[in-house]
Amino acid sequence: MSLRIYNTLSRALEEFSPIEPGHVRMYVCGMTVYDLCHLGHARSMIAFDVVQRWLRASGLAVTYVRNITDIDDKIIKRAVENGETIRSLTDRMIDALHQDADALGIERPTHEPRATAYVPQMLDMIGTLQGKGLAYQAGNGDVNYAVRKFPGYGKLSGKSLDELNAGERVAVQDGKHDPLDFVLWKSAKPEEPADVKWRSPFGEGRPGWHIECSAMGCALLGESFDIHGGGADLQFPHHENEIAQSEGATGKPFARLWMHNGFINVDNEKMSKSLGNFFTIRDVLKEYDAETVRFFVVRSHYRSPLNYSNVHLDDARAALKRLYTALSLVAPAPVEVDWAEGYAARFKAAMDEDFGTPEAVAVLFDLAGEVNRSKSPAAAGLLKALGRHLGLLQADPQDFLKAGAGLDEAAIQAQIAARAAAKAAKNFAEADRIRNDLLAQGIVLKDSATGTTWEAAQ
Protein backbone atom coordinates (compact mmCIF):
# COMPACT_ATOMS: atom_id res chain seq x y z
CA MET A 1 0.00 0.00 0.00
CA SER A 2 1.07 3.63 -0.48
CA LEU A 3 0.41 4.98 3.01
CA ARG A 4 3.31 6.80 4.69
CA ILE A 5 3.28 7.71 8.39
CA TYR A 6 5.70 9.82 10.43
CA ASN A 7 7.39 7.63 13.04
CA THR A 8 8.56 9.53 16.12
CA LEU A 9 10.96 6.67 16.85
CA SER A 10 12.85 7.00 13.54
CA ARG A 11 12.04 10.71 13.09
CA ALA A 12 11.10 10.01 9.47
CA LEU A 13 8.17 9.26 7.20
CA GLU A 14 7.93 5.52 6.68
CA GLU A 15 6.00 3.31 4.30
CA PHE A 16 3.40 1.59 6.44
CA SER A 17 2.86 -2.13 6.27
CA PRO A 18 1.21 -3.96 9.18
CA ILE A 19 2.97 -6.85 10.88
CA GLU A 20 0.01 -9.09 10.10
CA PRO A 21 -1.02 -8.51 6.46
CA GLY A 22 -4.38 -6.76 6.25
CA HIS A 23 -4.72 -6.20 10.00
CA VAL A 24 -3.55 -3.14 11.96
CA ARG A 25 -3.17 -3.28 15.74
CA MET A 26 -3.11 0.19 17.31
CA TYR A 27 -2.89 1.37 20.92
CA VAL A 28 -3.58 4.98 21.94
CA CYS A 29 -3.19 6.36 25.46
CA GLY A 30 -6.57 7.48 26.73
CA MET A 31 -7.82 9.59 29.60
CA THR A 32 -7.19 9.62 33.33
CA VAL A 33 -10.77 9.84 34.52
CA TYR A 34 -10.76 12.20 37.49
CA ASP A 35 -12.38 15.16 35.69
CA LEU A 36 -14.22 16.11 32.52
CA CYS A 37 -12.35 15.83 29.21
CA HIS A 38 -10.66 19.01 27.99
CA LEU A 39 -9.68 20.34 24.57
CA GLY A 40 -6.41 18.42 24.55
CA HIS A 41 -8.33 15.18 24.95
CA ALA A 42 -10.66 16.23 22.13
CA ARG A 43 -7.72 16.78 19.82
CA SER A 44 -6.19 13.38 20.52
CA MET A 45 -9.52 11.55 20.22
CA ILE A 46 -10.34 13.23 16.90
CA ALA A 47 -6.82 12.76 15.49
CA PHE A 48 -6.74 9.02 16.09
CA ASP A 49 -10.38 8.62 15.12
CA VAL A 50 -9.40 9.97 11.69
CA VAL A 51 -6.40 7.62 11.63
CA GLN A 52 -8.49 4.51 12.28
CA ARG A 53 -11.16 5.67 9.80
CA TRP A 54 -8.57 6.05 7.04
CA LEU A 55 -6.89 2.75 7.82
CA ARG A 56 -10.27 1.04 7.41
CA ALA A 57 -10.98 3.03 4.25
CA SER A 58 -7.67 1.68 2.95
CA GLY A 59 -9.05 -1.84 3.21
CA LEU A 60 -7.40 -2.79 6.50
CA ALA A 61 -9.00 -4.42 9.52
CA VAL A 62 -8.20 -2.40 12.64
CA THR A 63 -8.03 -3.50 16.25
CA TYR A 64 -7.98 -0.19 18.10
CA VAL A 65 -7.30 -0.04 21.83
CA ARG A 66 -7.73 3.21 23.78
CA ASN A 67 -7.24 2.68 27.49
CA ILE A 68 -8.80 4.32 30.51
CA THR A 69 -6.61 5.10 33.51
CA ASP A 70 -8.98 4.58 36.44
CA ILE A 71 -6.41 4.44 39.25
CA ASP A 72 -4.05 7.35 39.81
CA ASP A 73 -2.97 9.84 42.48
CA LYS A 74 -5.25 12.52 41.00
CA ILE A 75 -8.21 10.15 41.04
CA ILE A 76 -7.58 9.23 44.67
CA LYS A 77 -7.28 12.90 45.67
CA ARG A 78 -10.48 13.90 43.86
CA ALA A 79 -12.50 10.98 45.26
CA VAL A 80 -11.40 11.82 48.80
CA GLU A 81 -12.27 15.50 48.26
CA ASN A 82 -15.71 14.50 46.94
CA GLY A 83 -16.31 11.96 49.68
CA GLU A 84 -17.03 9.20 47.15
CA THR A 85 -15.50 5.89 46.19
CA ILE A 86 -12.93 5.56 43.43
CA ARG A 87 -15.38 3.48 41.39
CA SER A 88 -18.19 6.01 41.78
CA LEU A 89 -15.97 8.84 40.53
CA THR A 90 -14.43 6.92 37.65
CA ASP A 91 -17.76 5.45 36.48
CA ARG A 92 -19.24 8.95 36.38
CA MET A 93 -16.28 10.40 34.49
CA ILE A 94 -16.24 7.49 32.01
CA ASP A 95 -19.93 8.11 31.26
CA ALA A 96 -19.11 11.79 30.66
CA LEU A 97 -16.16 10.81 28.45
CA HIS A 98 -18.43 8.66 26.28
CA GLN A 99 -21.01 11.43 26.00
CA ASP A 100 -18.34 13.92 24.89
CA ALA A 101 -16.77 11.47 22.44
CA ASP A 102 -20.16 10.61 20.94
CA ALA A 103 -20.95 14.31 20.51
CA LEU A 104 -17.70 14.78 18.57
CA GLY A 105 -18.46 11.86 16.27
CA ILE A 106 -15.72 9.65 17.70
CA GLU A 107 -16.17 6.01 16.76
CA ARG A 108 -15.76 3.70 19.75
CA PRO A 109 -12.44 1.81 19.90
CA THR A 110 -12.43 -1.97 19.58
CA HIS A 111 -11.32 -2.27 23.21
CA GLU A 112 -11.44 0.33 25.97
CA PRO A 113 -9.73 -1.40 28.89
CA ARG A 114 -9.80 -0.02 32.41
CA ALA A 115 -6.43 -0.25 34.13
CA THR A 116 -7.94 -1.76 37.27
CA ALA A 117 -9.03 -4.83 35.28
CA TYR A 118 -5.43 -5.64 34.31
CA VAL A 119 -3.58 -5.53 37.63
CA PRO A 120 -2.67 -9.27 37.45
CA GLN A 121 -1.00 -8.72 34.07
CA MET A 122 0.87 -5.72 35.48
CA LEU A 123 2.14 -7.78 38.40
CA ASP A 124 3.28 -10.52 36.02
CA MET A 125 5.27 -8.00 33.99
CA ILE A 126 6.82 -6.45 37.11
CA GLY A 127 7.84 -9.92 38.29
CA THR A 128 9.45 -10.62 34.92
CA LEU A 129 11.38 -7.34 35.05
CA GLN A 130 12.56 -8.06 38.58
CA GLY A 131 13.66 -11.53 37.52
CA LYS A 132 15.75 -10.01 34.72
CA GLY A 133 17.41 -7.54 37.06
CA LEU A 134 15.58 -4.55 35.55
CA ALA A 135 13.50 -3.81 38.64
CA TYR A 136 14.18 -3.66 42.37
CA GLN A 137 12.17 -3.15 45.53
CA ALA A 138 13.17 -0.09 47.52
CA GLY A 139 13.19 0.24 51.28
CA ASN A 140 9.81 1.98 51.29
CA GLY A 141 8.18 -0.97 49.55
CA ASP A 142 7.93 0.61 46.09
CA VAL A 143 9.18 -1.39 43.12
CA ASN A 144 11.22 0.75 40.72
CA TYR A 145 12.55 0.27 37.20
CA ALA A 146 16.36 0.42 36.94
CA VAL A 147 16.63 2.70 33.91
CA ARG A 148 20.40 2.43 33.40
CA LYS A 149 20.13 -1.35 33.03
CA PHE A 150 18.01 -1.01 29.88
CA PRO A 151 20.37 -0.19 26.98
CA GLY A 152 17.78 1.40 24.71
CA TYR A 153 16.47 4.00 27.13
CA GLY A 154 16.15 7.42 25.47
CA LYS A 155 15.68 6.18 21.90
CA LEU A 156 12.17 7.62 21.58
CA SER A 157 13.00 11.03 23.03
CA GLY A 158 16.35 11.05 21.22
CA LYS A 159 18.30 11.92 24.36
CA SER A 160 21.14 10.22 26.14
CA LEU A 161 20.87 9.14 29.76
CA ASP A 162 23.24 11.93 30.76
CA GLU A 163 21.07 14.52 29.00
CA LEU A 164 17.95 13.14 30.63
CA ASN A 165 19.64 13.02 34.02
CA ALA A 166 20.77 16.65 33.68
CA GLY A 167 17.16 17.66 33.16
CA GLU A 168 15.89 15.58 36.07
CA ARG A 169 15.04 17.86 38.98
CA VAL A 170 13.91 15.15 41.39
CA ALA A 171 16.58 14.19 43.89
CA VAL A 172 17.32 10.54 44.60
CA GLN A 173 14.85 9.64 47.31
CA ASP A 174 12.68 6.85 48.66
CA GLY A 175 15.36 4.31 47.94
CA LYS A 176 15.74 5.02 44.21
CA HIS A 177 19.12 4.00 42.82
CA ASP A 178 19.03 6.78 40.23
CA PRO A 179 16.91 9.92 39.70
CA LEU A 180 15.74 8.50 36.34
CA ASP A 181 14.35 5.33 37.90
CA PHE A 182 10.56 5.26 37.94
CA VAL A 183 7.98 3.43 39.97
CA LEU A 184 6.32 0.24 38.78
CA TRP A 185 4.43 -0.59 41.98
CA LYS A 186 3.51 1.92 44.69
CA SER A 187 3.46 0.59 48.21
CA ALA A 188 0.18 1.26 50.02
CA LYS A 189 0.05 4.05 52.58
CA PRO A 190 -2.02 3.67 55.76
CA GLU A 191 -4.12 6.77 55.06
CA GLU A 192 -5.15 5.68 51.56
CA PRO A 193 -8.65 4.27 50.90
CA ALA A 194 -9.02 0.50 50.88
CA ASP A 195 -10.29 0.47 47.29
CA VAL A 196 -6.90 1.59 45.91
CA LYS A 197 -4.94 -1.31 47.37
CA TRP A 198 -4.18 -4.67 45.76
CA ARG A 199 -2.36 -7.63 47.26
CA SER A 200 0.87 -8.53 45.50
CA PRO A 201 4.17 -10.38 46.01
CA PHE A 202 5.62 -6.95 46.84
CA GLY A 203 3.04 -6.15 49.51
CA GLU A 204 -0.19 -4.19 49.27
CA GLY A 205 -0.16 -1.34 46.81
CA ARG A 206 -1.18 -0.19 43.36
CA PRO A 207 0.44 -0.02 39.92
CA GLY A 208 2.41 2.93 38.62
CA TRP A 209 1.00 4.78 35.62
CA HIS A 210 3.52 3.59 33.03
CA ILE A 211 3.18 -0.15 33.68
CA GLU A 212 -0.57 0.07 33.08
CA CYS A 213 -0.24 0.80 29.35
CA SER A 214 2.52 -1.77 28.83
CA ALA A 215 0.42 -4.52 30.37
CA MET A 216 -2.82 -3.59 28.62
CA GLY A 217 -1.11 -3.16 25.24
CA CYS A 218 0.59 -6.56 25.43
CA ALA A 219 -2.54 -8.29 26.75
CA LEU A 220 -4.84 -7.01 24.01
CA LEU A 221 -2.53 -6.57 21.01
CA GLY A 222 0.39 -8.90 21.65
CA GLU A 223 4.00 -8.28 22.61
CA SER A 224 4.67 -6.44 19.31
CA PHE A 225 2.07 -4.39 17.46
CA ASP A 226 1.88 -1.80 14.70
CA ILE A 227 1.07 1.67 16.04
CA HIS A 228 1.25 3.35 19.43
CA GLY A 229 -0.21 6.84 19.65
CA GLY A 230 -0.84 9.68 22.06
CA GLY A 231 -0.26 13.35 22.71
CA ALA A 232 3.19 14.88 22.24
CA ASP A 233 3.33 15.48 26.00
CA LEU A 234 3.42 11.70 26.53
CA GLN A 235 6.53 11.08 24.43
CA PHE A 236 8.70 11.49 27.52
CA PRO A 237 8.63 10.07 30.07
CA HIS A 238 5.47 7.97 29.61
CA HIS A 239 6.09 6.40 26.22
CA GLU A 240 9.82 6.12 26.80
CA ASN A 241 9.06 4.21 29.98
CA GLU A 242 6.54 1.98 28.21
CA ILE A 243 9.25 0.93 25.77
CA ALA A 244 11.69 0.19 28.58
CA GLN A 245 9.14 -1.91 30.48
CA SER A 246 7.69 -3.82 27.54
CA GLU A 247 10.89 -4.49 25.62
CA GLY A 248 12.74 -5.19 28.85
CA ALA A 249 10.16 -7.83 29.75
CA THR A 250 9.65 -9.45 26.32
CA GLY A 251 12.92 -8.82 24.50
CA LYS A 252 10.86 -7.82 21.44
CA PRO A 253 10.10 -4.45 19.81
CA PHE A 254 6.99 -3.05 21.52
CA ALA A 255 5.39 -0.84 18.86
CA ARG A 256 6.89 -0.54 15.40
CA LEU A 257 5.60 2.97 14.82
CA TRP A 258 4.97 5.82 17.28
CA MET A 259 2.56 8.66 16.46
CA HIS A 260 2.16 11.85 18.50
CA ASN A 261 -0.41 14.59 18.01
CA GLY A 262 0.60 18.20 18.64
CA PHE A 263 -0.19 20.45 21.57
CA ILE A 264 -3.24 22.68 21.80
CA ASN A 265 -2.82 26.29 22.89
CA VAL A 266 -5.44 28.89 23.77
CA ASP A 267 -4.91 32.32 22.20
CA ASN A 268 -1.25 31.37 21.64
CA GLU A 269 -0.69 30.43 25.29
CA LYS A 270 -0.43 26.97 26.80
CA MET A 271 -3.79 25.82 28.12
CA SER A 272 -3.70 25.63 31.91
CA LYS A 273 -6.02 26.16 34.85
CA SER A 274 -3.57 28.62 36.43
CA LEU A 275 -3.83 30.94 33.40
CA GLY A 276 -7.61 30.77 33.45
CA ASN A 277 -7.73 29.54 29.84
CA PHE A 278 -8.62 25.92 30.54
CA PHE A 279 -11.65 24.65 28.63
CA THR A 280 -13.48 21.36 28.87
CA ILE A 281 -15.13 19.90 25.79
CA ARG A 282 -18.47 20.80 27.37
CA ASP A 283 -17.40 24.42 27.81
CA VAL A 284 -16.68 24.67 24.10
CA LEU A 285 -19.87 22.85 23.05
CA LYS A 286 -21.93 25.48 24.86
CA GLU A 287 -20.74 27.99 22.24
CA TYR A 288 -20.07 25.89 19.14
CA ASP A 289 -21.67 22.84 17.60
CA ALA A 290 -19.68 19.61 17.80
CA GLU A 291 -19.03 19.31 14.06
CA THR A 292 -17.49 22.78 14.01
CA VAL A 293 -15.13 21.72 16.80
CA ARG A 294 -14.24 18.58 14.88
CA PHE A 295 -13.68 20.54 11.66
CA PHE A 296 -11.47 23.01 13.56
CA VAL A 297 -9.25 20.11 14.65
CA VAL A 298 -9.26 18.21 11.35
CA ARG A 299 -8.26 21.10 9.12
CA SER A 300 -4.88 21.28 10.88
CA HIS A 301 -2.34 18.47 10.57
CA TYR A 302 -2.36 16.18 13.59
CA ARG A 303 1.34 16.82 14.34
CA SER A 304 1.06 20.62 14.18
CA PRO A 305 0.36 22.82 17.21
CA LEU A 306 -3.28 23.91 17.28
CA ASN A 307 -4.30 27.34 18.53
CA TYR A 308 -7.79 27.60 20.00
CA SER A 309 -9.54 30.97 19.92
CA ASN A 310 -13.04 32.23 19.26
CA VAL A 311 -11.78 33.78 16.03
CA HIS A 312 -10.53 30.40 14.79
CA LEU A 313 -13.72 28.61 15.84
CA ASP A 314 -15.86 31.27 14.16
CA ASP A 315 -13.81 30.85 11.01
CA ALA A 316 -14.18 27.07 11.20
CA ARG A 317 -17.95 27.45 11.55
CA ALA A 318 -18.10 29.75 8.50
CA ALA A 319 -15.94 27.38 6.44
CA LEU A 320 -18.02 24.33 7.37
CA LYS A 321 -21.15 26.29 6.50
CA ARG A 322 -19.80 26.80 2.97
CA LEU A 323 -19.47 23.04 2.53
CA TYR A 324 -22.97 22.40 3.82
CA THR A 325 -24.36 25.19 1.64
CA ALA A 326 -23.04 23.36 -1.42
CA LEU A 327 -24.70 20.15 -0.21
CA SER A 328 -27.98 22.04 0.30
CA LEU A 329 -28.18 22.94 -3.41
CA VAL A 330 -28.80 19.43 -4.70
CA ALA A 331 -29.62 16.06 -3.14
CA PRO A 332 -26.40 14.00 -3.01
CA ALA A 333 -26.56 10.83 -5.10
CA PRO A 334 -25.17 7.58 -3.66
CA VAL A 335 -21.71 7.06 -5.14
CA GLU A 336 -19.09 4.34 -5.25
CA VAL A 337 -15.83 6.22 -4.74
CA ASP A 338 -13.26 5.62 -7.48
CA TRP A 339 -9.98 6.41 -5.74
CA ALA A 340 -8.12 6.61 -9.04
CA GLU A 341 -10.17 9.51 -10.40
CA GLY A 342 -10.06 13.28 -9.93
CA TYR A 343 -11.05 14.67 -6.55
CA ALA A 344 -11.01 11.25 -4.88
CA ALA A 345 -7.46 10.57 -6.08
CA ARG A 346 -6.29 13.92 -4.69
CA PHE A 347 -8.05 13.23 -1.38
CA LYS A 348 -6.43 9.80 -1.15
CA ALA A 349 -2.98 11.18 -1.98
CA ALA A 350 -3.36 13.72 0.84
CA MET A 351 -4.48 11.17 3.40
CA ASP A 352 -1.85 8.64 2.34
CA GLU A 353 0.86 11.19 3.16
CA ASP A 354 0.81 11.01 6.96
CA PHE A 355 -2.94 11.61 7.20
CA GLY A 356 -2.71 15.02 5.51
CA THR A 357 -6.08 16.37 6.55
CA PRO A 358 -5.38 20.04 5.62
CA GLU A 359 -4.83 19.02 2.00
CA ALA A 360 -7.80 16.65 2.15
CA VAL A 361 -10.04 19.47 3.43
CA ALA A 362 -8.80 21.66 0.56
CA VAL A 363 -10.04 18.97 -1.84
CA LEU A 364 -13.46 19.14 -0.17
CA PHE A 365 -13.64 22.88 -0.86
CA ASP A 366 -12.62 22.41 -4.49
CA LEU A 367 -15.31 19.77 -4.83
CA ALA A 368 -17.87 22.06 -3.13
CA GLY A 369 -17.04 24.65 -5.79
CA GLU A 370 -17.82 22.06 -8.44
CA VAL A 371 -21.17 21.34 -6.77
CA ASN A 372 -21.96 25.07 -6.69
CA ARG A 373 -21.24 25.37 -10.42
CA SER A 374 -22.74 22.16 -11.75
CA LYS A 375 -25.47 21.32 -9.24
CA SER A 376 -24.42 17.73 -9.91
CA PRO A 377 -25.95 15.10 -7.58
CA ALA A 378 -22.94 12.86 -8.23
CA ALA A 379 -20.49 15.61 -7.21
CA ALA A 380 -22.54 16.30 -4.07
CA GLY A 381 -22.56 12.57 -3.31
CA LEU A 382 -18.79 12.41 -3.66
CA LEU A 383 -18.39 15.43 -1.37
CA LYS A 384 -20.44 13.72 1.32
CA ALA A 385 -18.65 10.38 0.81
CA LEU A 386 -15.19 11.93 1.15
CA GLY A 387 -16.28 13.97 4.16
CA ARG A 388 -17.32 10.76 5.92
CA HIS A 389 -13.68 9.66 6.12
CA LEU A 390 -12.98 12.75 8.24
CA GLY A 391 -16.17 12.37 10.26
CA LEU A 392 -17.71 15.42 8.53
CA LEU A 393 -20.69 16.41 6.35
CA GLN A 394 -23.04 13.61 7.41
CA ALA A 395 -25.78 15.84 8.88
CA ASP A 396 -28.79 17.04 6.91
CA PRO A 397 -27.56 20.29 5.27
CA GLN A 398 -30.71 22.25 6.05
CA ASP A 399 -30.66 21.13 9.68
CA PHE A 400 -27.01 22.19 10.01
CA LEU A 401 -27.59 25.56 8.35
CA LYS A 402 -30.75 26.28 10.35
CA ALA A 403 -28.96 25.44 13.58
CA GLY A 404 -26.16 27.79 12.60
CA ALA A 405 -28.66 30.56 12.02
CA GLY A 406 -30.10 29.97 15.48
CA LEU A 407 -33.57 29.33 14.05
CA ASP A 408 -35.61 26.20 13.55
CA GLU A 409 -37.96 25.56 10.64
CA ALA A 410 -41.04 26.65 12.59
CA ALA A 411 -39.41 29.96 13.55
CA ILE A 412 -38.37 30.66 9.96
CA GLN A 413 -41.85 29.85 8.64
CA ALA A 414 -43.38 32.12 11.29
CA GLN A 415 -41.19 34.98 10.05
CA ILE A 416 -42.15 34.23 6.43
CA ALA A 417 -45.85 34.31 7.41
CA ALA A 418 -45.39 37.60 9.28
CA ARG A 419 -43.68 39.10 6.24
CA ALA A 420 -46.50 37.93 3.97
CA ALA A 421 -49.03 39.54 6.31
CA ALA A 422 -47.04 42.79 6.30
CA LYS A 423 -46.95 42.81 2.49
CA ALA A 424 -50.69 42.12 2.30
CA ALA A 425 -51.25 45.12 4.57
CA LYS A 426 -48.94 47.15 2.30
CA ASN A 427 -46.54 47.60 5.23
CA PHE A 428 -43.51 47.18 3.01
CA ALA A 429 -41.12 48.69 5.54
CA GLU A 430 -41.99 45.89 7.99
CA ALA A 431 -41.72 43.27 5.24
CA ASP A 432 -38.25 44.56 4.36
CA ARG A 433 -37.24 44.58 8.03
CA ILE A 434 -38.17 40.91 8.40
CA ARG A 435 -36.29 39.99 5.22
CA ASN A 436 -33.19 41.89 6.40
CA ASP A 437 -33.35 40.39 9.89
CA LEU A 438 -33.41 36.90 8.41
CA LEU A 439 -30.57 37.76 6.03
CA ALA A 440 -28.48 38.94 8.99
CA GLN A 441 -29.01 35.47 10.46
CA GLY A 442 -27.88 33.73 7.26
CA ILE A 443 -31.35 33.09 5.79
CA VAL A 444 -32.14 34.24 2.23
CA LEU A 445 -35.81 34.47 1.20
CA LYS A 446 -36.85 33.54 -2.36
CA ASP A 447 -40.19 34.89 -3.63
CA SER A 448 -42.03 33.19 -6.48
CA ALA A 449 -45.54 32.88 -7.89
CA THR A 450 -46.15 29.86 -5.66
CA GLY A 451 -44.96 31.50 -2.43
CA THR A 452 -41.81 32.20 -0.45
CA THR A 453 -39.05 29.69 0.28
CA TRP A 454 -35.74 30.11 2.03
CA GLU A 455 -32.15 28.94 1.75
CA ALA A 456 -28.96 29.50 3.69
CA ALA A 457 -26.84 32.44 2.58
CA GLN A 458 -23.72 31.41 0.68
Swiss-Prot record:
A motif ('KMSKS' region) lies at residues 270-274. One of its GO terms (molecular function) is zinc ion binding. InterPro entries: Cys-tRNA-ligase, Cys-tRNA-synt_Ia_DALR, Cys-tRNA/MSH_ligase, CysS_C, Rossmann-like_a/b/a_fold, tRNA-synt_1_cat_dom, tRNAsynth_Ia_anticodon-bd. It is found in: Cytoplasm. Binds 1 zinc ion per subunit. One of its GO terms (biological process) is cysteinyl-tRNA aminoacylation. This is Cysteine--tRNA ligase.
